[in-house]
Amino acid sequence: MSASTMLLPFQPSSMSTAQLAAVSFLARYSGRTHRLYTYQLKRWFAWCEGNGLDPLVGIQRAHVEVYIRHLGATGLMDSSIVTMMHGVRGYFRFAHIDGLIAADPAVYARLPKVHRDESRTQGLDRLELIRFLQVAQTLTVHHGALAFLLGINALRASEAAAVRVEDYSDTLRGYRVIHLVGKGNKPATMPLTVPVLRVLEACRGERTSGPLIRRPLSGKPVDRRDVYRMVARIAKAAAIPRHLSPHSLRHAAITNALDAGVPLRDAQILARHADPRTTEHYDRARGNLDRHGVHFLTAYVAGV
C-alpha cells in the first residue's frame, strides 16, 4: 500500500483528510473490532487508489455501489460483503458527523440481502451439553473449567481466556461471583453456581492470582485460538459428530436456559445481549422445529 493510502502510524502533519478521518474513526475501537475495521478500510483505500479516487473527498454513492459489486466479483459471499462494508459505512458516517463531508455517500448504498436460516445454528441440546461438560472434566481441569464457563455462564471465547483467579474471589449477597469485561468493554458480574465453582477451584489449585485457564502441557495462559482447539478436543472426546466452536457452547447455554423455562429477560441478562431481539433469535432457532405449526396441522388433518 502506498503512502497515500496508509492509515498508520499517526502522522497528522503529513496525512490527508481521508487518512485523518480513518484514524479518528478507528480510535473508537479496540481489539478484534479495531483490527477488522482497519483491514476493511485498507481494502477500501487500496481500491480507491487503484481507481484514481480519494477515499473520502468527492466520493459519491455510485462509487460505493461499484465497490460493493467489486467485492462480489472477488468471490465474497453476500454475508461477507455485508460484513466487509461495516467499517466503510462507519467511516463515512462519522466523517459526515464530524463535518468532513457534506453528505454520507454510503448510507443509501444497496447491500446484498442476507437471509439467515434460524434453525441452522443449533448448538447442543440438553443431553449433548451434559455429555460435553462431563467429558471435559475427564481431560484436564483446564478443559473442565473452560467448558463450564462457556456452556453454563455463556462466556465468549476471549472472555473465558481472560478470566483470572482474582476475578471470582468476591462474594455478593451470599453468592460467589465472577467479574469480567465483555464485548464493548462492558463490565459484568455473574453468579457462580456450585458445579461451576467446583471446576474453577479444581483448575485454580493452590494459585491465588494470575490467568485461570492455562495450556495443560506448557502451563502458559490460553488465548482465543487455544480456546477453539480445546473445545474441538472436548467435542471429539465426547463423540459429538459435528463441528463445535466456543460460540456453539454459548449458544447452547442460552438455548438450554430458554428450554428450561428461564424468562426471556433473564436469558438476555445471562447472554448480556443489549437487544432482547438477539436473545429471541436463540429461542426461535430451537423452537422453530419443536413448535412448528406443521405438527399441529398434521394432527388436525391426520385422517386424510
Task: Show where each model-derived region lies.
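Conserved catalytic core of the tyrosine transesterase superfamily
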Residues: 1-304
